[in-house]
């Protein structure tokens, strides 16, 4: 009797495993059927719901004429692996790349250049995942939108993302109201991500709605702001966080920062420079070891970071939480 029961039990286990393997096979077939290999230059000018997988070097994908790549799942556009070089993605105004899951655009460790005048978005985290790449270039033009409901541009944790260049004249933002809500994170867990260069031009907006820092940098990186960088959750939250050493932040012209500017405890060589013009007054909420310098020769008042122009009054003791004062 026991032997018979054991045999029935074994048959049921084998049947279960067979059904499971068959289901997995069918799932992979469905996933693969919704993917297109891209081995040469390609233009998309209508709705395409298939994942675009770049399989060769020096491929240029152009999305134009209100065309879109709309992926149900993650990774709407990706390199096939870390050996893929020279990928260029251009998204024209009115066109878009979206996904319902994470990593809308994933570099997979390969080379990638993104020129966006349209929309890159996901309902969850990581509109752009830099995934251990080196030298990625992202240009977000005026009218361009890069957004997520989590960390929006990410090159962190174990993946890093050295020598990333971001030039923004549009909007880069996160709508997440809790944690994992940064607009840009380019710092891995031990702060060895280096060489980031972020320029936020006049009219450019980088902001978030949650508890985390709006922008997070690793080490030996630069951030130049002539637009706006805002932590919309609270002026007590960090707008700019420097996790490592030897970073340089330059705040220019009529640019504003809403939120704290913080260098992490124990870091060295971090610089905060002001270039708002002669006689212009400003006040920033800062913390950590930062070397302050006004490039226009205005006197910098430490405490937070304030400057007074000729004949102006000192703003050092005002309780203004942040921003630029004219």
How should each PLM-predicted stretch be described?
Residues 2-5, 10-318, 323:
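Long, low-complexity, polar and repeat-rich extracellular regions
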């Amino acid at each position: 009797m026991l032997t018979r029961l054991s045999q029935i039990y074994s048959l049921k286990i084998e049947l279960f495993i067979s059904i499971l393997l068959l289901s997995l096979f069918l799932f992979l077939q469905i996933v693969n059927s919704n993917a297109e290999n891209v081995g040469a230059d390609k233009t998309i000018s209508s709705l395409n719901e298939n994942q675009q997988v770049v399989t060769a070097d020096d491929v240029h994908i152009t999305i134009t004429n209100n065309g879109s790549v709309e992926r149900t799942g993650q990774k709407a556009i990706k390199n096939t692996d870390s050996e893929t070089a020279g990928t260029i993605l251009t998204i024209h105004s009115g066109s878009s790349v979206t996904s319902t899951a994470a990593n809308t655009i994933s570099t997979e460790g390969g080379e990638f250049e993104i020129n966006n005048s349209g929309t890159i978005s996901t309902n969850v985290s990581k509109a752009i995942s830099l995934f251990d790449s080196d030298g990625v270039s992202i240009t977000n033009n005026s009218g361009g939108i890069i957004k997520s409901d989590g960390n929006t541009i990410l090159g962190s944790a174990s993946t890093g993302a050295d020598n990333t260049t971001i030039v923004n004249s549009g909007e880069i933002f996160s709508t997440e109201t809790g944690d994992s809500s940064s607009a840009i994170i380019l710092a891995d867990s031990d702060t060895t991500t280096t060489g980031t260069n972020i320029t936020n031009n006049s009219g450019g907006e980088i902001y978030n709605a949650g508890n985390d820092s709006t922008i997070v940098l690793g080490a030996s990186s630069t951030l130049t702001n002539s637009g706006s960088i805002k932590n919309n959750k609270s002026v007590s939250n960090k707008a700019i966080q420097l996790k490592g050493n030897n970073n340089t932040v330059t705040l220019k012209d009529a640019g504003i920062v809403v939120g704290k500017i913080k260098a992490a405890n124990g870091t060295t060589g971090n610089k905060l420079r002001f270039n708002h013009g002669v006689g212009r007054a400003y006040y920033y909420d800062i913390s950590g070891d930062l070397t302050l310098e006004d490039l226009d020769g205005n006197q910098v008042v430490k405490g937070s970071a304030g400057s007074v122009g000729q004949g102006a009054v000192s703003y050092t003791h005002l309780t203004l939480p942040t921003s630029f004062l004219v």
